[in-house]
């Protein structure tokens, strides 16, 4: 892998991690079209670190508030809305952890293909469009209860299927439950923090045990590029959806999915 490849891949990861357009659908393009080799475990860990740093920094006030309330609820019996939301995020994380543990090998073996990604990109794009147009968008994240958190968590679990998009699935589920677009996005982004931590830790453990060589220059490129691009993406995404809704991302998903099908049919 060259510095140019590491920059492009980290840029793609950073820009697509938090948009409802599927990072896996985009990361397959360089290998499918340009023949680039797999970036390896070390680089995967690096871009996880970069995107995690971006979302934590952007929502630093919320993260500090939720963490403080979470521990206060354990040691002091805090029952504030922040403590409740923190526990709901924990609950929403459980389905993805269980589903990932049980289904990881099956997904890797049978579902990690360009055909699956093209299909899920279109199907879940249409689902996002329907929900965005027909659901009541009134509630914020603090009005969630354990049933809603679990439902959104199950949507996050489904997103282990390549092309679905973790943020796309969770935002779609939150919109269906009546969250405003901004609240759905915030809840999705806050939910991403424990998932990215767990996924990055798992990949880091695999890296340590694999003995894979580490190129510090490529890793630094990956961390910095994914951090900057993810931070910019979060900022402008929240501003865009308040004015235009999810339609631009639905259109993009449909174009991408059709484009992938067209490319695959010519091979």
From Swiss-Prot:
Primary location class: membrane
Where found? Cell inner membrane
Q: What is its EC number?
A: 3.6.1.27
| Residues spanning the membrane | 1-21, 39-59, 83-103, 111-131, 149-169, 189-209, 218-238, 245-265
* Catalytic activity field: di-trans,octa-cis-undecaprenyl diphosphate + H2O = di-trans,octa-cis-undecaprenyl phosphate + phosphate + H(+)
Could you identify this protein by its name? Undecaprenyl-diphosphatase
GO BP terms in the entry:
cell wall organization; peptidoglycan biosynthetic process; peptidoglycan metabolic process; regulation of cell shape; response to antibiotic
| Described function | Catalyzes the dephosphorylation of undecaprenyl diphosphate (UPP). Confers resistance to bacitracin.
- Keyword line: Antibiotic resistance, Cell inner membrane, Cell membrane, Cell shape, Cell wall biogenesis/degradation, Hydrolase, Membrane, Peptidoglycan synthesis, Transmembrane, Transmembrane helix
Can you quote a single GO CC term?
plasma membrane
């Amino acid at each position: 892998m060259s510095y140019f490849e590491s920059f492009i891949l980290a840029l793609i990861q950073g820009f697509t991690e938090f948009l409802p357009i599927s990072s896996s659908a985009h990361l397959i393009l360089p290998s499918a079209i340009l023949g680039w080799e797999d970036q390896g475990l070390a680089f995967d860990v690096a871009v996880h670190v970069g995107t995690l740093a971006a979302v934590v920094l952007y929502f630093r006030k919320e993260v500090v508030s939720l963490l403080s309330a979470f521990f206060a609820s354990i040691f002091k019996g805090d029952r504030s809305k922040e403590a409740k939301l923190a526990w709901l995020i924990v609950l929403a994380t459980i389905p993805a952890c269980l589903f990932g543990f049980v289904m990881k090998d099956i997904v890797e073996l049978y579902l990690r293909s360009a055909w699956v990604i093209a299909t899920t990109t279109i199907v879940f794009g249409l689902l996002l469009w329907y929900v965005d147009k027909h659901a009541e968008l009134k509630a914020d994240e603090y009005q969630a209860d354990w049933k809603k958190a679990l439902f959104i968590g199950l949507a996050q679990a489904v997103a282990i299927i390549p092309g679905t998009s973790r943020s796309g699935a969770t935002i779609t589920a939150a919109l269906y439950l009546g969250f405003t677009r901004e609240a759905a996005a915030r809840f999705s982004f806050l939910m991403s923090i424990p998932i990215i931590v767990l996924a990055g830790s798992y990949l880091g453990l695999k890296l340590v045990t694999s003995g894979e060589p580490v190129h510090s220059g490529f890793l630094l490129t990956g961390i910095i590029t994914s951090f900057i691009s993810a931070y910019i993406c979060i900022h402008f995404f929240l501003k865009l959806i308040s004015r235009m809704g999810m339609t631009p991302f639905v259109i993009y998903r449909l174009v991408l999915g059709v484009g992938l099908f067209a490319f695959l049919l010519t091979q």
